[in-house]
Amino acid sequence: MEISSEILTPATTDKHPLIGTPLVVPIIICIFTGVIGGAAYSAVVTVSLPASLVLGGIYGLVFAVLCHRRAVSPGAGLIWGLGFALLLWLVVRAGIVPVIAEGMSAIGRVDFLRAQFPQLVAYVLLLGMPLGIVLGIWGGLQVRPTQAAFSFRRALVGGGLAGCVGGWVFGRWMDKVDLFPVLGGLVNSHTRASGLAVHSLVAIVIGASFGLLFQRDIRGYGSSLGWGMAYGILWWFLGPMTILPLLQGRPLDWSYQHGSALFGSFVGHIVFGLIVGLTYAVADRLWVGFFTDSDPINREPEGPGARTVYSLGWGAAASLAGGLLFSLVMLATGALPRVARLVGGTSPLLGFVVHLVISAIIGMSYGLLFRREAPDKGSGVAWGLLYGLVWWFLGPLTLYPILLGGSLTWTTQAAGLALPSLIGHLMYGAATALAFIVLERRHDEWIRLDPRLAAREVRLRRPIGTPAPALWLFVLGLGVLLPILLG
């Protein structure tokens, strides 16, 4: 299920059209941006200003050297920036600092990691985000013949529509917890109607910015979920953790205690991001299909109906491996009787059957969403882990309590109780994705016999060199880490 057939690859040359040594320009830009970020970091986290300036400049230099060829657009640069910011925090604040302070025994201690939570927010917002966007803007100005054309109108319309849909869903939870009057206070009107208007406007703006940033990176419905999830996490840091208190005239509070109090908003932003990503991908595919796509020569070797049936079948078959692995976790934690409650029973055997049916449905959805996303088995496992994480947020924290007649349980208590299920969801996603790509590749072997069809198949797959690795690091890292730290 591809969104576009263009190849998205980094430039094949390092040469800038105007400057003989192109690396000098991004290095200067990133050092300057890193120094500014270091100054802001010093002011917010209250550490030594000279040290922050030097470290910010060094980080900007390293980021420019490593990512100047990969940050081919502002969106790609942003994802690389977020991934490297999390990596920096893991190495420095979660690795080196604990060892220096208390020795090797301090590594991985939750209390120590919680104490470093303000630095995590600062690294993401003050270093990763600005460095990524600035370097991506520079990269987007370079001439790359193989890069897909950008449509400003398509990005705004599709993104705005996605923001409307995501905002409507997120707004249901916000209305339940009475947050609209709080947003209405930003325009001096503490009413539900004014808060709803502010929320809707912000959702549309975020959706439109998603389209502007990531139009060239969104190739399939599955990967769009990942990009949307990453953008939702970023906006949780940026919105309720930062912009909202500043607009209300309150000091910034990036402590883990404040983050824990906003855990419901964290899950809500993830769900919002998932809906924005998927809705944008659908809208973008429809736009391209109706107004852009025309390729009478390079026809698909199979019709859309056959491709859909194959994807559903492979997904259902692959889910058997993931579902059986997940059932081991459920058996160990005694979760099968709770699953049986979905159909009015309590038997572990009934729960196992219901679990396999749900696994097959999710596996079929994986087949529809993620076909042609992975160029190799390693990439397939990464997408599978991400999809398993997606269903941990959508399943036990969102849909399961609703199906039992309850309400959303976006609380740290519910997340803590569901942590064993998180392990099971990750195992399920990885095993299902690995089995799926094996089945998919076995079927596609006959296509590779024709050089023309083989070349088209390669062109339709996500190429190596996109920001996907940084996306996996950022989403999987924070998607697993934050429920533990904030719980």
Regions found by a protein language model. Give the residues of each.
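Juxtamembrane/disordered regions of integral membrane proteins
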Residues: 2-487
